[in-house]
Amino acid sequence: MALTILKAENHRRMPWKNGGGVTVEIAVHPQGASVDDFDWRVSMATVASDGPFSVFPGIDRTLSVLEGDGILLDVEGEETKLTRESAPLAFAADARSSARLIGSAITDLNVMTRRGRLAHNVRRLPVDGTTLTVADGNPALLFCSEGQLDLNSGSEAVRLEKLDCAVFAGGNAEPLTIRGKGTAFLISIVAI
């Protein structure tokens, strides 16, 4: 398994596509792709005010709240409350969508894939001193949103600090053992 660690201090900052804020790009494929030509992309953003989401034609998106009180997300007139405890929410990134803050600003995690080429799945994994074992044959990313996590793939052992991300480029055919105290998001990318 090919394992790459993306350290938080190296994540790339750039303006939102709609100019309304700043996004922190964690990972993108192909490497160096722009917001218009990526196959998949994982990023974070701080939402400090109510407003529309950027439109990404032909893209599917999953949104998770990492910090803050949450948002009321309106996608094509259907409103969903998203908080740190909510399951990640999948929706079309080309759908008309906007957010209203429930309280203070939030930080969110965005996972996006090009529809018709790839699909993705996002799972929140709380780790509280226990050991979790994840086995999945698809390319995957493990994003540490809180705490410190020790990963062991059988052939490699690494530590993720808050906001670090591990990329398993060749898929995770070996079981991945996660130890520590914190929260991770397991992101699987699947070719269609």
Segment roles from a protein language model:
Residues 1-192:
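Jelly-roll (double-stranded beta-helix
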